[in-house]
Swiss-Prot record:
Miscellaneous remark of the record: Present with 3500 molecules/cell in log phase SD medium.
Job of this protein: Has a role in the negative regulation of gluconeogenesis. Required for vacuolar catabolite degradation of fructose-1,6-bisphosphatase (FBPase).
Taxonomy, superkingdom: Eukaryota
Segments of this protein annotated with the region Disordered: 188-215, 372-422
SUPFAM superfamilies (alphabetical): YVTN repeat-like/Quinoprotein amine dehydrogenase
Source species taxonomy: Eukaryota, Fungi, Dikarya, Ascomycota, Saccharomycotina
Keyword line: Cytoplasm, Phosphoprotein, Ubl conjugation pathway
PANTHER family: VACUOLAR IMPORT AND DEGRADATION PROTEIN 27
Family: Belongs to the VID27 family.
Major subcellular site: cytoplasm
Protein name per Swiss-Prot or TrEMBL: Vacuolar import and degradation protein 27
Modification Phosphoserine, positions: S170, S195, S196, S222
One Pfam short name: VID27
Amino acid sequence: MNILKKFMESGNKPELITIPSGQFNLLRSKNSPKAALECIYNNATLSVRKIGKFDYELAVYRVEDDSEGGTGDEAENFEDDTISVLSTQSKKKEEEWSVEISDKIMFHKTWDKQGNVALVWENLRGDEQDEKVQFVVAADVSFSDVEQFIQTVYRCQFEVRNKKSSLTASADDLKEIEHRSTRLFVQDDDDELDSSSDDFQDAKDTSFEHEKESEILERTPSPLKKVPEGEYCCLVMSSLYMYDPIQEKFILQEPVVKVAIIDTGKYEFWLAIEGKDNRLGTQVAPNINPTFELATDAFLFNYTLQNITLSYMLKFKDLDKCIQFRFAWVKCLWMTLNKETWTDVPEKEKDYILDSSSVPLEKQFDDILHIDDRSNEERDKESSESENDSEDEDDENDHSKRIISSEAFEEPRRATSKGNSSLTVAFRNNRSYVTRDNRIGVFKTDDEDDSLEFVAAIKNISNLGGKSIDPHKPMLYMEDRNLILTDGENENKLYKMDIERGKVIEEWSTGDKNVVQYGPTKKFDQMTPEQTIVGVSQKGVFKIDPRINGKNKIAVDESKDYVGKYNFSSIGTTESGYIAIGSEKGDIKLYDRLGIRAKTAIPSLGQAIKFITTSADGKWLLATCESTLLLMDLKIKDGKNAGNIGFLKSFPASENVKTYVLKIRPEHSASILTYTKKPIRFTKAYFNTGIGQQEQTIVTSTGPYAISWSLKGILNQDGSNNYPYRIRRYNADVVADNFEFGSDKKVIVALKDDVSLSKVKSFKQPSKGVLMPSASLQDFYG
């Protein structure tokens, strides 16, 4: 639900942000002879309005509701009470209530006795002392929207107090406002966190007294005070850290906090963190980038407020506590994503889900025991390699020579162009093809000087009937002389385009099968005269053969449909023609050929599989999800099928597919999210590819960042800061990137309006200089 109403007018007062639904109540002190709680507006909205350069007000609007329309004496009494609360209001007092925002109102968040989120502040216009007002937020308003509203109020308080823009406010400035409001309120609030609680009584000196801190962390905590109503799935103690992007390290915020995961119903769960000075809450969801580091007994996650994303770390007392929390987290996250109960999941699938939730789990356990075993020589070598990568100034200076504007194939230039939309790299020659509206630009690489050159443009692409089409999902075909395309509209039609002629020469129908994705029958078929291709619909997998007589080109005897919609979403093939199919649910099926049952079914980890690519030999599978990559080792290690791959034989009951979940670490993604204001969304990830070459590097992108992973780095993570990925930031969003065929040294990158050739060694270790321009660091600290 979008609650922002920037620049929308309410009379002459612009509303900055609005909570669209809730109940407005008057809260009297316990000493009042009147009722402690009285409903003012049964249905209302709450807004922040700008009334001056650095002046703001909270405004509550009454929304007409049948339940409020009383008659007779009862209505008279209710109206009189309303007037006492609104005693200084204008004639609109029965429909609207407002108060200027200042430190005096002590605005803060709490929960009512029913577990609903409530916003409370001082009633400065009341007839009695210690009166407060309360806005109980409707259940259909998201927690993130509420947090956004609260942070807006605190920023307004900052501007009112300091008479300057809140863009200059540091995180500490806003936290001070929040803490002051909360501290002054808790003195009169019996439900507030008790600062004398046994859980926190020794916490004052724990910053330097690790023994006392350890004793506190061992305790079984009492339930949290201000959290949504629901069943506790987990309740533990930890220390709380926050990542400082300036110092590039985690800073202790509080030595002892309570941590709970709460089942709020309908497969939704809430992570609550509560200490003496800190209180955080967020939904259990993948978009907070949850990451476990078992080698350090830690859990990392992102927390977004306003347009700033912070990275927090919970550090548990020991591995047992971390594993206890991890088990609850993985289980609740899986239920949130799949809308199914954990008890319904088969035991083998449970093991796979739990084993795959850390990257790599087995390796991290090994690190715990052997983290200092590596030789100094090996560490020095890695350090040297890292320095060489980060000091590649020649490549930086050369980079401008290797950027080609895509506008070169727009004549005349079109102001309405949507920009580049895809990149396809040839295998047989040094060409690359970039789609842009109804054009395709042809580029070539020159190995002698590592340059990229614009060759030609295929313009005004149209179908056989002469209707202009914008090409989608291009795939090179038949010795790289043709492209297979869709038009983005007809899901059961494919087009074959002759590249040399620059024209569509054939149209293929797939009958009643809507093609979701398609690819070569074998990984390197585009280098051969092979004419068949494979594809998936939402409920089936099939082969397309253009030699079949008639319009429908589906090879029925080499196709398989499933009963009901499986929501297949992606397909990939190996050099031998083994097939992997992913679904929107997140599961993957492996086949040795079409038309039969899958040899291996890999359970879902929760996120949809957008794209699949495989290593040539079928040992590795790489799946692209929204914010993660799944790297799967398909080689069977145990049992009678040991040595085989999952395409040919099923995994034994005692063994699961080894899966590495690749993601951007929370402290890095926090900088990315704050800089781009967009969530992480990976483009299709690729292995480096070549005949007889070993896959050893992965490349993908999100926003303006191209990202590469080293397979060796993934398999040899040691818990240090030598991250297995490197990043390069561009001045525009990356549409797609892929390796030059036969090399893992150079990456072709399609930007919105440009095409670039970059060396992999120009990608850097993630740091504040790489992730954000220096000017944008003020987003965090003013």
